[in-house]
Amino acid sequence: MDFFSEYGDSSRYKIQEIVGKGSYGVVCSAIDQHTGDKVAIKKIHNIFEHLSDAARILREIKLLRLLRHPDIVEIKHIMLPPSRRDFKDIYVVFELMDTDLHQVIKANDDLTKEHHQFFLYQMLRALKYIHTANVYHRDLKPKNILANANCKLKICDFGLARVAFNDTPTTVFWTDYVATRWYRAPELCGSFFSKYSPAIDTWSIGCIFAEILTGKPLFPGKNVVHQLDLMTDLLGTPSMDAISRIRNDKARRYLSSMRRKQPVPFSEKFPNVDPLALKLLQRLLAFDPKDRPTAEEALADPYFKGLAKVEREPSCQPISKMEFEFERRKVTKDDIKELIFREILEYHPQLLKDYMNGSENTSFLYPSAVDNFRRQFAILEENGGKSGALDRKHVSLPRATTVHSTSIPPNEGLDATSQVTQRIPTARPGRTVGPVLPFENPGAADPHSARRVVRNPMVPPAAANKSGYSYNLKSDYSDRQHQEELEKDRVQYRPAQHLMDAKVAPDTAPDIRSSQYYFTRSAPRTDLTDRAALQGSMLYGIAPFNGIAAVAGGYSKVGAVQYGVSRMY
């Protein structure tokens, strides 16, 4: 299937089948061959053809990154485009869900009271989280709520959502009138320009819950007038105060001139339904928005007694105004493209770090030699070291070196000396350093700080290198003698063909090939200095972002010198 075009990491996913199509593109189910998880990959093509579509996509992927909740669909990954400047499609990887609530309602006419309660509980729990972030979904409907066979629901499609900020007006131009009218609150009927509040989502949840109870839409209006007729047939004629909140002049005049209607008892409209469920539904469908409960208040309703504990339900911190600055200023397609690229990098942390540091090398995405070597050695480690190290194909790379791991039990008869490593300098912009653990406080507890240095049986004592990265805390050398010894060892034990890494990063590239010691983790902790404690099984050097990659070790759980960017997956 020609699905990924020229995207470089497409081999990570094994496409299964097409599960959806639309004007935006196509959705396929797939297997993530790195994790074994089933995923849904949404290919959105020509995203910059229309600026409004691109802004909607940016809004959705940004909100789904910021709103992490069990009842909101999760973006697991966004594939890197082959070019920072010229990409047109994006591939968003979601967790795979079986179906949506619309299909569940249509296919099941025997949903139980427990189903009804659990479905509403999950929707309100997600809504509470969304609203505490000052986000309004604005397009809640059964098709935008995904479902699994185990009755798990997740809200999706935040393309029409908006974030409200305390210092800005909440009145916005309602550009997306094509959103489904059936689930739209009465104060929005016919309005292209409206002030909105969280109550619009509460109304939508009420309409969805009524559809779950009956199996059919509650207010399937053919137009605005018909929609208002259906609402008032059930709820009765609203008060003049409620009518005044409707911004559309024609809708307001129509309701004001309407004959008086009495509300229909919900017990007649919804027979054989739990009375507590009907009381809550009536609150959710209050015509006046100020009479509707918040999601948090609805979760505290007696209907959820024994199921929900409001104080236990998670809330979200309000979203920063800077995240949605693009909503309040005029932007070009290039601006939106750069912002979408920035969002994609959120799923590739090392590239994001380089991007934020101002590195121009973020245009180099793949496939690089660094990535290929990293992927090969990851496979070797996953296979338990059953196959040997791969042959190097570039003469500038160091030869393969085996660094023993702590899996070899130390001989109790050998001398042990507590040692720590020297602090590795912080990387400059455009360069990366492996995960060094700062050890500014020697008294702080650190599970990686205690080390036992045991004789490496693979290196003869005569070849021992007094490396600057493995100091003996009780050395008898003077500073001058010590430096002379280091220089002598460096000349003696670093052959000419292996000097490339020292030239690239002379201050940070450790020589671990001839060390007679390896670290163990069993010894008790002794005196420590304020130097950095570096985990023995994760030694990192640094090099320019697009520099030469050097990797050591062909076996499982061995130490490695890793150059370039960190693992992107």
UniProtKB/Swiss-Prot annotation:
Top class in the EC scheme: transferase
InterPro entries assigned: Kinase-like_dom_sf, MAP_kinase, MAP_kinase_CS, Prot_kinase_dom, Protein_kinase_ATP_BS
Assigned keywords, A-Z: ATP-binding, Kinase, Nucleotide-binding, Phosphoprotein, Serine/threonine-protein kinase, Transferase
Residues noted as binding ATP in the record, renumbered to the chain: 19-27, 42
Any Pfam family: Pkinase
Modification note: Dually phosphorylated on Thr-175 and Tyr-177, which activates the enzyme.
Residue stretches making up the Protein kinase domain: 13-304
Catalytic residues (positions): 139 (proton acceptor)
Motif TXY, residue numbers: 175-177
The keyword Transcription is assigned to this record: no
Regulation (activators, inhibitors): Activated by threonine and tyrosine phosphorylation.
Gene Ontology cellular-component annotations: cytoplasm; nucleus
EC number: 2.7.11.24
Modified residues (Phosphotyrosine): 177
Biological process terms in GO annotation: intracellular signal transduction
Region (Disordered) residue spans: 401-420
Domain comment as written in the entry: The TXY motif contains the threonine and tyrosine residues whose phosphorylation activates the MAP kinases.
Protein's name in the database: Mitogen-activated protein kinase 7
Gene: MPK7
